[in-house]
């Protein structure tokens, strides 16, 4: 079976197994998803959701994040790990949102990746799940591991894996494909093709 055939088989099988696959970060607006995704680096979605429950009560706007005392923000996000860097990135990101985007989250890859703490993965999460735009494939640890095990790529870096997946998958499945593999990785923990 070629890589293209494997990708096609997955696009056919995974929606039957995971028809409800979606982003498991809790959010109500683009800013909340942006902040939650920054916090999700090296952290579980479950932990992030516990943290953001309180964080989203304290900070409601980009200006709130930009102006909160750094020590207070660090304390709120401490349990997500790497909390000083994450707090610093969130504040710088939100200050840029206020200064350059009227406090709103932009809906382009270029504008998002220009923000502190926002790489392609975070931008793809926001674009795909808030704005319905498929600019790329989210490559987290599950997608990275399973794409290799399922023979979709031989590459090891997220950027190269993303490029390989974008070549193999129809654009309309880029966002969903990540959700399917993430759900598969979290629920099954192994990379057999679902039947």
Regions found by a protein language model. Give the residues of each.
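Catalytic cores of DNA base-excision repair glycosylases
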Residues: 2-195
């Amino acid at each position: 079976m070629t890589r293209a055939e494997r990708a096609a088989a997955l696009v056919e099988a995974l929606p039957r197994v995971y028809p409800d696959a979606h982003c498991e970060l809790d959010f109500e607006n683009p800013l909340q998803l942006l902040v939650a995704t920054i916090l999700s680096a090296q952290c579980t979605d479950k932990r992030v959701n516990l943290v953001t429950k309180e964080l989203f009560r304290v900070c409601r706007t980009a200006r709130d994040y930009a102006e909160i005392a750094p020590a207070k923000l660090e304390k709120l996000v401490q349990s997500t790990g790497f909390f000083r860097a994450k707090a610093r990135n969130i504040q710088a990101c939100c200050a840029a949102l206020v200064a350059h985007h009227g406090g709103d989250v932009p809906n382009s890859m270029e504008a998002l990746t220009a923000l502190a703490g926002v790489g392609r993965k975070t931008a793809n999460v926001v674009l795909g799940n808030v704005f319905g735009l498929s600019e790329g494939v989210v490559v987290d640890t599950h997608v990275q591991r399973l794409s290799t095990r399922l023979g979709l790529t031989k590459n090891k870096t997220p950027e190269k894996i993303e490029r390989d997946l974008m070549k193999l998958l129809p654009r309309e499945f880029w966002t969903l494909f990540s959700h399917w593999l993430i759900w598969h990785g979290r629920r099954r923990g192994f990379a057999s093709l679902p039947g």
